[in-house]
Every structure is written in C-alpha cells, then in structure tokens.
Amino acid sequence: MLYWLLKKWIPPEDRKRVVGNLVTLRMQLDEEVPAKNTEADLLLATWNIRDLGKTNRRGFGERLPETYFYIAEVLSRFDFIAVQEVNELDEWEKITKILGPAWEWIATDVTDPALGGNGERLTYLYDTRKVLFRNIAGEIVLPAKLLISSSVQPSAKDKDTEAVTVDDKPIGRQFRRTPYTALFQSAWFKFEICTVHIYYGDESGAKLEERIEEIKRIADYFGKRAEKSLEDGRSLILLGDFNIVGRDHKTMKALLEAGFEVPKALREAPATNVEKDKFFDQIAFRTRPGDLAYLESAGAGAAARAGAVDIFKRLFTAEKFEDYKAAVEATSNAAHNEDMEAYYLDWRTYQFSDHSPLWVRLQVNDSESYLQDLAAG
C-alpha cells in the first residue's frame, strides 16, 4: 500500500480523520481475515464493487478520494480477487496505484449496455508475489444449442448480435455479462477460474427464470471441463455475484446441481448484501477432496478459512453522518430526499459498495505430501 499518496490526494484538513479510519479498518481486518503469508495459503476473494468507474452515478455523486484508500485496504488483505462492476477504468486505476507495483490485473472489455450488461467489466486482481498468471484467459460464448431463453425481447437493433432466430423470432441469447475465465497458479496450486455477474432481472416470473437459467448454463458449461482439468492437476473455481437469493433457493440449487460444491465454511458465512439477508455472492469448487477438507477444518479469527467482510462495521457508520453531510447534500439526489441521514445510508453504498467481499483460504503448498509420496517410492 502506497500510503504516501494520502499526502497527495487527501486535503490536510481531512487527513487525520481519514488516517484514523484506515487504522480502524486495518484493526477490523486484522481481527477477521488471516494474515497473508508467502508459503502455505492463498487468500482468494470475490467482491462486487458498486458502479466502480461508472460515468452515470445515478445522482449519488462521485466517490470521495478517501474511499479509494478504504477499497484498496480491503483488497490488499487478499492474494487474488475477482471483482465485478468495474466500468470505466479511472477509479480502478487509482485503487491499483494505491496497492502498489506488486499488483497486476486483467479484465474484459465493457459489456454492451444494449444487451443488459450495464457497461461492466469482469476483472481479476492478483498479488504477483503470490500468484502467477498462466497466460490464458477468455470470455465464455455459448454455442447455439445452449443459448439462454430471453425474458425480454431483443430490439431490432441488437437482434442479430445476441439471439438465434427461427423465422426471424429470437429463441435464445448469450449471457447478459459474459463470464470470464483464466488460468492461474499459486505455489503448487493450479486453478482455472471463472467469474460471473449473473443477470438479476426480477424476484419472480420470467426474469427470475432467466437468472436461474444463466446460473445453470455457466455451471454446466464450465463444469464440463472438470474431468480434464483435474487430470491436468487444475482445480475449477466458479465465483462472483450470482444474485443467489438464499441457501435453499432454486438459484442456489441451479449452481449445486451441476456438481460444484460450496464448502460448509462458505455456506455458513454471513450474507453479502447490505441488508444481510441475501447470499448473492458465492465461491464454488470442482477440486480435490483434500482442498475442501482443509476449508471445512476452519476456526475463527486468524484460524478462519472463509468469511465475509462487513465493510460498514466501522466505516461509513450511521454515527459518522456528520463527517459526510456536506458531500451527501451536494449530490443531485439530495434535493429529492427530506431525510438526509436515511439517504446517507444509501449514498454510502455508492461510495464503498452494496456487497461485502466473500473470501476463502486455500492450501497451496503440497511439498510435504509430495516428499512423503516420493519417499514411499
């Protein structure tokens, strides 16, 4: 973390408060997330950072410079993070600059807003001191027979690019946001990873069914690689914002029925939306039994092997409204809200996020078992 940028980006009158917030956040992360090390474990996370770099901020105003430091502080506690909702790259590049030169990232191009993808990118961020990119990455494009039933009829403008037609009638479409897959390695652990931001649609009806179908399609399609990948010594990890409603909801069943496993340590992690009642974000595996057994033998605190970071536990709390009152009142939405303190609780999700990071701790050093096998002949 390049903390010297605080002197450059944070006005002197705000610096003491911002540094105090960073110290408080660091203390929280020390309590909740295991310390990074260079040998035994990989800390892997997924985080939907709301409207990062979006030019149209829906009337909530721009992110404050201090927020980039808070986001970077959270990201810095992991070795590898799949990030959703990265739009234009100006804010993202500020955050990665704060992280420092040891960090690298790869990303998709923006999705076409006309296709329902909101102009978003899917992104992988990784600490090069721990993770090696294996030079293969790509977006998943479904063959015609696997296209997703559309809950919304495409316009004539984009019918040719997103739908298969019979007698000029659309019968299917690609993902609203194309899943992004890549190969990485950390020590002995090789993994093929795919991140998603699944279409939300609605809470019921055809749009919910389209959401479920997107989950099924990516789990089935990516899961077909499992046998070959495991033979080659690679684990499959499917993660991101699935917009899964609950652990027993059919959105979750759509993921698990394809053979992916969500370890108990993750199933028992807190909900990742602000209201703490939805399990939108997930990390699922097709991997060796030993990898999952390691996750299941989790403890608490420094011994934890999965969790979710409550980003509003100590920052942007209701009690800190006065610190941000001027910024809140300066937004264009403020004119339409009489209760500024209630509006602030919504505004803060456009500063930090409306999702909590979900993370796991994976064992990546197989030296001992390898040497034992070698000695056994």
Give the predicted meaning of each segment.
Residues 49-65, 167, 202-210:
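Acidic/histidine-rich helix-loop elements
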Residues 41-54, 135-139, 190-200:
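Active-site-proximal beta-strand elements of phosphoester/diester hydrolases
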Residues 23-38, 181-187:
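Short amphipathic alpha-helices and their capping/turn segments at secondary-structure boundaries
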Residues 22, 82-189:
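Structured beta-strand-rich core segments of catalytic domains in phosphoester-bond hydrolases
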Residues 67, 71, 88-91, 95, ...:
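Stable alpha-helical elements in mature extracytoplasmic
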Residues 176-178, 184-220, 375-376:
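Metal-dependent phosphoester/phosphodiester hydrolase catalytic core
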Residues 44-49, 74-93, 125, 182, ...:
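Active-site beta-strand/loop signature of hydrolases that rely on acidic residues for catalysis
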Residues 1-31, 89, 224-235, 243-377:
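Metal-dependent phosphoester-hydrolase catalytic domains
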